[in-house]
Structure formats: C-alpha cells, structure tokens
Amino acid sequence: MTSSTPPSASPPPPGTTASPAPVRLKPLRSLTARGKGETHRVASPLELFFDLCFVVAIAQAGIQLVHAVAESHAGEGILNYAMVFFAIWWAWMNFTWFASAYDNDDVLYRIVTLVQIAGVLVLAAGISRAFEDHEFVAVWLGYAIMRFALSWQWLRVAWSAEGAERTMALRYAAGVLICQIGWLGLLILPEDGRAWLFLVMAPLEMCVPIYAEKDHPTSWHPHHIAERYGLFTIIVLGETIAAATVAVKSGIDENDALGELLPIAVGGLLIVFAAWWIYFVVPIHGHLRSNRQAFLWGYGHYVVFASAAAIGAGLEVAVEQAVGEAHISTLAASAAVTLPTALYLLAVWILHARHFKVGLAQQLVLPVAALLVICSTFLGEWAVLAAGLVSALAVATGTTLTARLVARESRESPGQASSAVM
C-alpha cells in the first residue's frame, strides 16, 4: 500500500464507465475513533474471518461438553464449559466493540487482529486437556495472547488520543493486563479453587469496560454492533446444525437407527430454525442508544451464545443416548436439549423481543414456550421432537398475534405500520 498518486490512465472506450480509482492509504495510520453516525457501516472481511476462527474454539468446547454429559459428568462438564466459553466470548466481545469504535484497517491493526486469532486457536487446542485433565496451561496461554494483543491496541489508541479519551484507553489497557495476571490462579490454585476464581475474575473482567468508559464512552456504531452480534449468532447456530448433522449421520451409518434418530433430527432442526427466527424477527440496533443499554445487551449475549452452542451439544448427546453409546438416562439426554433451548428462548426474550412486543399476549409467547419446552423433557424419546414443535408453535403464535395487531392498527390508523413483533 502506498500514498502516492496513481499514474493517469487512458480514457475508457465510448459507452463504458470508468471504474473508480482505488483509494490508496498509508500502511500505518493513527488509531483514532470512528464516527458513531457513520453511514453504510458493515462488518469487514477481517471481522468475519475472526468470527469463523472463534467458532473453532466454540466447537471444541461443545465436543467436550458432549463427552462430559454423555459420561454422566454433567455438573463438572457444564462448569468447565461455562469457564472456557467465557474466555472465548469475552475475547470476541472485547474485539468486536473495539473494532466498532476504532477499526482503521491498517497493517498493524490487521497483524494484531491475526495475533488474536492465533490466540483463540491456541486456546481451542487446550480445551480438551482442560476438560479431561483439568490442565489450563494452553487455555490460559491462548487467552493471554488475545488479551495482550487487545491491550496493545488500546495503547495505540492512547498514543493518538488526548484528554478523557486517552485516560479511557489507558484504563482499558491496564484493566486487561491486571485481569490477565489474576487468571494466573488457574495455573496455581488447586482444582477445587478454580470455580471460585472464575466467580471472582469474570465479574472483574466485565467491570473493566464500565470503569474505563465512565468519563468517556467509545464511539461504537449501533448498526455495526447489531450486525456483528447477529452474524456471530448465525455462525454459532450453523455450528449447532453441523454438529447435530454429523452425530445423526454417524448414528445412522454405525447403528442403522433411522427410526430412533428421526424424531431427534426433526425436533433439532425445528429448534434451530425457531432460534434463528426469534433472534432476527426485528432489528435491534434502534434499541442500543446508550452505554447502559449496550452493556446489558452485550453482556447478556453470553447466555445467548452459550445456550445456542449448547443446543448442538445436547442434540449430540441425545443421539448418542438413542443409539446406546451414552451412559445416561433418556431423561438426562432430553434435558441436555430442552434446558439450553428454554434458556435461549428466555434470553432472547429478555434482550430482544420484549422491547418491541405490544400487550400481555405477545409478551407471554416466549416465556410460556420456554416453560413448555422444559415440560417436554419428561416425554421420553419424543422430548426433542416435542421441544421442536413447541418452538415452532411459538414462532407461529407470535407471527399470528403480530399480524392481527397490524391489521387492527391499519384499520384504526391507515398508513401507519406497527412496531410489534413476534
């Protein structure tokens, strides 16, 4: 890349339109804030590549959760999953919000982002040992690589900024590094102390942005943030479908168990389809108007992403139990699907849907659906199919209620569209 003026070119042939000359920028530029009202802001190819690499780590966490639950170690597996998933999600979230405010796409920014990607791949490589041997060296190292890279980005911001913005950037850089030192407890403390360390360090990590931005908020872009979260949700749901598909295929190929697996396959597909529908039924960027709203919404997505990925792990467990490879009961296997599904429905309702619903009937659709999904746990081999049908029925009910409301408002106020949603 260079900043020189390109040589003049011959005029285009008659009847054709000349392509615009590429914009030539310096390879190294100041890392300054982007405009919050910037038009046509969309996710960059680097951000999409970043997401795809992070899903590799999520897939590894899901695989280990399947093994733990299938071997009757659900409690230990869920705890390890929560800890590892927090590391993945928190590193992804910090990068996402930083990029929304400061992405200048210069050479150094790209290199540091690629270092963060390398970090999550190191973390992913250590997930199996964290679950099986309770050894967190690779997980800590991968997380440290990502956090040191992020701290460097904030120091670049501080170098270019002044006043309150510079103070904010320095607070971020220092907070990230201090928390990383705290996570050394994963390598030092006995196994019984790691859960307590997590309960202390996770809230401390989440306090860093709140403290850093108390005097000067970053200029994150609402539409860009909503798109980034939406794209990551799609990728996680895609990984859920991929994992469940592989499990069903293996069950059919190795055990010729199509009859036993068909209800799980159909129910799982309905659950994932409904999960996509209720998340994207209405754009959320209009709700993100302040840091307070953004923090609650962004932090709440830990539950959305973790439960969405856990649905795929649960479907794998249900398949293994159906073909006799899991050492758990049908009830436990069913709960592995229904509980994360219900949690996802509730989380999306709290973070998204309730802000746009009109009337008690609309507000109750997703909470009631979550309750019915939990009740379907007790339906034996039909539990997953029942949960899928309930999820699909929730979508249909919400859509019907919205259509009726729109029709009524159209009669009362012609020309005005309703904002109510499923």
What residues fall within each predicted segment?
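N-terminal acidic, proline/glycine-rich, low-complexity intrinsically disordered segments
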Residues: 1-11
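Predominantly late transmembrane helices and immediately cytosolic-facing juxtamembrane segments
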Residues: 15-49, 53, 81-111, 118-130, ...
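Alpha-helical transmembrane segments of multi-pass membrane proteins
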Residues: 52-67, 376-377
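Short, hydrophobic transmembrane alpha-helix segments
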Residues: 62-77, 100, 129
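Loop-to-transmembrane alpha-helix initiation sites
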Residues: 192-197, 380-391
